[in-house]
């Protein structure tokens, strides 16, 4: 009797990526005029000078936001610092977050090339709204997914969660035969928009960086030949909390919306720990230290100083974080979706420039998510050869 040949399970792979943004584009050079006009702070020249400097240092050229001047005029409590406005903010986000997620999902599904009925799992991640049933439930309806799709909803994880969802999708795909996981991260930062005040200057930093966006990633193991074209293999994941950094990024749900605090120590915390968490991440792969310059990177750009610290402490050559800096410049900090935008930019640029792999011609790479805790979540990726 001939031996039975079994298909060995493979690591989960990213099979498609889709992204979406609201239609409203805000150029950074014009944003200070907009912000101080709509919040009725044009007389605050001292604060305006400070905000101008923050915008100049942000290295962000433009962002996409759902919020418009007309919405603010209709809802003045949103731009009045401390005024109760949680209800109207949540009413906006509970509708718009699933819709933006739907737009990104349809792009990913189109690239994937498989019937939508083959999606078995859905992970939805947002920090913008907290209704029950949640955005996962709403997206099931918007996309017409099977009501028996296994859903997981992640609320209020923050900016590191773009890597978290890859870890979860990997587990689902590798432990459920034939699973195809739709991962969606979507943020509408209307909940974080505030009027200006002398007592809470962190708001100025958020106003210069935060933006709206959604990403959708389809993950599965054992891709179907000639139908599914993998982009990246998810090899290993690791999460850690940086010591004594709890105050670094904090957000609280209050009647005034989501009140947040951003410590100037965050770049220092990341820079002081990046070699350690990178070393421990790659120990899970082969137990060896990597030449960091041999990797491709998708680093959550919580701000330019964080990106600079990662580059400096790892001794990266100029241009190693090109994709990260490009997304920060063209989209701002969109929270969890941002690292997926970076991977999308990277694979597109790799194809455009005739590279051999989706990871800028390199084999190994890493996604670094950074957020409240301070929590760092890393995902080791292996690129795929470009054959199209």
Swiss-Prot record:
Pfam families, alphabetized: Chal_sti_synt_C, Chal_sti_synt_N
pH-dependence of activity, as noted: Optimum pH is 6.5-7.0.
Record note on quaternary structure: Homodimer.
Protein name per its UniProtKB record: 4-hydroxycoumarin synthase 2
Gene Ontology MF annotations: biphenyl synthase activity
Similarity comment: Belongs to the thiolase-like superfamily. Chalcone/stilbene synthases family.
Induction / repression: Up-regulated by elicitor.
One GO process term, biological-process aspect: 2-hydroxybenzoyl-CoA catabolic process
Cysteines joined through disulfide linkages: none
Known catalytic reactions: 2-hydroxybenzoyl-CoA + malonyl-CoA = 4-hydroxycoumarin + CO2 + 2 CoA
Domain of life from the UniProt record: Eukaryota
Coiled-coil region: none
The entry's keywords: Acyltransferase, Transferase
Temperature and activity: Optimum temperature is 35 degrees Celsius.
Stated role: Type III polyketide synthase involved preferentially in the biosynthesis of 4-hydroxycoumarin from salicoyl-CoA. Can also use benzoyl-CoA and malonyl-CoA to produce 3,5-dihydroxybiphenyl as a major product and benzoyldiacetic acid lactone as a minor side product. Can also use m-hydroxybenzoyl-CoA as substrate, producing m-hydroxybenzoyl diacetic acid lactone as a derailment product. No activity with p-hydroxybenzoyl-CoA, CoA-linked cinnamic acids or acetyl-CoA.
Matches recorded under CDD domains: CHS_like
Entries under InterPro entries matching the protein: Chalcone/stilbene_synt_C, Chalcone/stilbene_synt_N, Polyketide_synthase_type-III, Thiolase-like
EC number: 2.3.1.208
Biological classification of the source: Eukaryota, Viridiplantae, Streptophyta, Embryophyta, Tracheophyta
Active-site residues from the entry: 159
């Amino acid at each position: 009797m001939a031996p039975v040949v079994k298909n060995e399970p493979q690591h989960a792979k990213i099979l498609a990526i889709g992204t979406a943004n609201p239609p409203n584009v805000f150029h950074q050079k014009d944003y200070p005029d907009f912000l101080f006009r709509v919040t009725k702070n044009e007389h605050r020249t001292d604060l305006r000078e400070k905000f101008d400097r923050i915008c100049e240092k942000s290295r962000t050229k433009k962002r996409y936001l759902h919020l418009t001047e007309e919405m603010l005029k209709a809802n003045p409590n949103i731009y009045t610092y401390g005024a109760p406005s949680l209800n109207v903010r949540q009413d906006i986000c509970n509708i718009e977050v699933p819709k933006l997620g739907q737009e990104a999902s349809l792009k990913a599904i189109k690239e994937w090339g498989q019937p939508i009925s083959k999606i078995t799992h859905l992970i939805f991640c947002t920090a913008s709204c907290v209704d029950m049933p949640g955005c996962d439930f709403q997206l099931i309806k918007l996309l017409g997914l099977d009501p028996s799709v296994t859903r997981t909803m992640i609320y209020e994880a923050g900016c590191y969660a773009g890597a978290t969802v890859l870890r979860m999708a990997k587990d689902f795909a590798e432990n459920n035969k034939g699973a195809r996981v739709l991962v969606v991260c979507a943020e509408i930062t209307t909940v974080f928009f505030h009027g200006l005040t002398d007592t809470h200057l962190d708001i100025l930093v958020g106003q210069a960086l935060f933006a709206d966006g959604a990403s959708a990633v389809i993950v599965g193991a054992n891709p179907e030949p000639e139908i599914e074209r993998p982009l990246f293999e998810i090899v290993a994941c690791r999460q850690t909390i940086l010591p004594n950094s709890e105050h670094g990024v904090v957000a609280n749900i209050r009647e005034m919306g989501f009140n947040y605090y951003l410590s100037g120590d965050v770049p220092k915390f990341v820079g002081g720990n990046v070699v350690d968490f990178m070393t421990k991440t790659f120990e899970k792969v082969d137990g060896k230290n990597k030449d960091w310059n041999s990797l491709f990177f998708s680093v959550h750009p919580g701000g330019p100083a964080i990106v600079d610290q990662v580059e400096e402490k790892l001794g990266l050559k100029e241009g190693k974080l090109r994709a990260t800096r490009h997304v920060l410049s063209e989209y701002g900090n969109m929270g969890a979706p941002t690292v997926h935008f970076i991977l999308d930019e990277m694979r597109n640029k790799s194809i455009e420039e005739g590279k051999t792999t989706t990871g800028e011609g390199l084999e190994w790479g890493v996604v670094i998510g950074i957020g409240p805790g301070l929590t760092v979540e890393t995902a080791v990726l292996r690129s795929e050869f470009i054959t199209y």
